[in-house]
Each structure stands twice: as C-alpha cells, then as structure tokens.
Design a protein with these regions (language model features):
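Bacterial N-terminal signal peptides that target proteins for export
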Residues: 1-10
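C-terminal motif of bacterial Sec signal peptides marking the signal peptidase cleavage site
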Residues: 17-20
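Solvent-exposed N-terminal domain segments of exported/luminal and surface proteins
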Residues: 24-133
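Short, compositionally biased P/S/T/A/G/V-rich stretches that sit at domain boundaries
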Residues: 28-44, 52, 145-172
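Exposed aromatic-hydrophobic patches
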Residues: 121-128, 217-227
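Short, aromatic- and glycine-rich surface loops/edge beta-strands on solvent-exposed regions
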Residues: 129-146, 231-247
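Short beta-strand elements
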Residues: 149-163, 250-268
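Short helix-loop boundary/capping segments
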Residues: 156-222
Length: 268
C-alpha cells in the first residue's frame, strides 16, 4: 500500500507547502506540480508579498483549492516549526531562468535559489514585493525543457484581500465560539482559523482546533471542539484568508496560493 499525500490548503499561509499523508491503494506516476505562494507582510504603512515558487516532479498529491472548503473543524497536533517540505520527498523541477511577477506598473523577478534540499524561486528584494492585498498579479513562468523541465505558463490572478476579525472572548465551557470577520468579495477564498493551546501536561502550544470556512463573514466553532482551547491556561489564535488559482500546466498542474494572515508577519 502506498501513501497519497495531500497539500493542506491552510499550510500555504505558513509560506511553506507541507505534507500530510493518508492511505491509498493506487500507485500514481509522477506528475509536474508547481506552486507560487504569495504571502502578505506588513511593511511600514503598507504591505509587501513574500513570493516563493516551487516546482516538483511528484506523485500522489492533491492540489489545494480555496473554492471547495470543508466548512468544519478538526482537532490536531500543532507545531511552530515549518514541518516537512515537499522538497525532502520529491525532486525539484526547472521552471526557467526567472519568474516575472507584475503588479500594476511594477515588474519583479523571482530567481532560483537552493534552499535545503530543493530549488525555490524567490525575489532578491529582502523586504518582498510591494503591493496592496486584493491587487491582481500577472505571472510569467518561462518553463524549461528536459526530463526535469516544468511547462511554461502565464496567468493573471487576484490576491487575497485584507480583513479584520471582530473581537471575541473565550466562551464558557460547553458553549460555541461565534466568529465574525470582513467577508470576501467572491467565492474564490476560504477562511482558516487555528486555535492553538497547550495540551495537558505541557507549557507550550502543541495542540490546535483547525477550522476552514466559506468566506461569508460568519461562522462558529462547535462547543465540543473549542472546549479544550477554552480550558487551557495557554492560548493563541490565528486567522488566514486563502485565495487560489489552479490550472493545468503541460502534463501537470499549477497552483497560485495567496494569503492574508492575522497576525500579519512583518517584512524583514
């Protein structure tokens, strides 16, 4: 029996594509998969994007898409570390000499860099690419030939918009937690909330209630899920608007993943 690996949509918000596994009885042949994550960062009074392109010769991946959320919660372990990159499992592919990213009248380039065991395409601007969340981005990936060459693809996609979450307080044990936030402008977003807490016998955040909702501005965490978070002496929460654009690319697939997070990371 082999493993089928899913790229969790929420983990795009952490600027790394990580791996979770479940069982499958089907052996899949390798397929080219490409990702460009576009993560909002605070930069003075405005924002920049931490843009990272990653391309893999992979098998058994399911592409994350924001327009099919599971609109529910689950409990799972939490770690502040970035987890397992796909680059530790699958070989990187060559997507060309550079990737062009255009926002408005400004054009920036992402260049290949070796990061640990894989090749990632990144900007040479340390602080990131200036933009306003919600802007449309035009991307040109030239592609390359050869056994590990990724197909050329060009597209224009909208980035995730900024949002706010209405203040809330932990409910009484046995009660649900109602959430309200600025709704998205269309159905190509999903909202992800993570309620992190220290489990029994721990003084660090090591458990979480993970919820993914339709981006309509309101939902709730059922009492049976939020109770452990409410009862823990150490708590934190995180929210992310995730927007995707998915398309075929040659014999494989490409996924543009844009996120706006609260708390919003600060640009270097």
């Amino acid at each position: 029996m082999t493993n089928r690996r899913h790229v969790p949509l929420v983990l795009a918000a952490a600027t790394a594509v990580l791996v979770a596994c479940n069982n499958s009885s089907t052996q899949l042949t390798s397929v080219p998969y490409g990702f460009l994550t576009f993560v909002a960062q605070k930069a003075g009074a405005g924002y920049t994007a931490n843009a990272v392109g990653s391309f893999y010769d992979a098998s058994g991946l399911s592409i994350p898409t924001a327009n099919a959320p599971w609109d529910s919660c689950r409990m799972q372990a939490y770690s502040a570390s970035s987890g397992t990159s796909l680059g530790t499992i699958f070989p990187s592919m060559n997507a060309g000499a550079s990737i062009q990213v255009k926002v408005g009248t400004r054009t920036d380039s992402l260049f290949p860099q070796v990061v640990n065991t894989e090749t990632q395409y990144k900007s040479r601007i340390t602080a990131g690419i200036p933009y306003t969340p919600g802007d449309s981005v035009s991307v040109v990936i030239p592609g390359a030939t050869g056994d590990f060459g990724y197909a050329a693809i060009s597209f224009k996609a909208k980035t995730a918009e900024a949002f706010t979450v209405q203040p809330f307080v932990p409910p009484a044990v046995g009660s649900r937690l109602d959430l309200r936030w600025t709704p998205g402008q269309d159905l190509n977003n999903t909202m992800v909330f993570s309620f992190r807490y220290a489990g029994a016998g721990s003084d660090v955040l090591n458990q979480q209630v993970m919820c993914q909702y339709r981006d309509d501005g309101a939902d709730s965490v059922p009492a049976k899920y939020i109770a452990s978070w409410v009862s823990s002496p150490k708590q934190a929460w995180y929210a992310s608007r995730v927007r995707t654009w998915v398309a075929p690319a040659g014999k494989g697939y490409f996924d543009f993943i844009s996120t706006f997070d609260i708390p919003t990371p600060t640009a270097p």
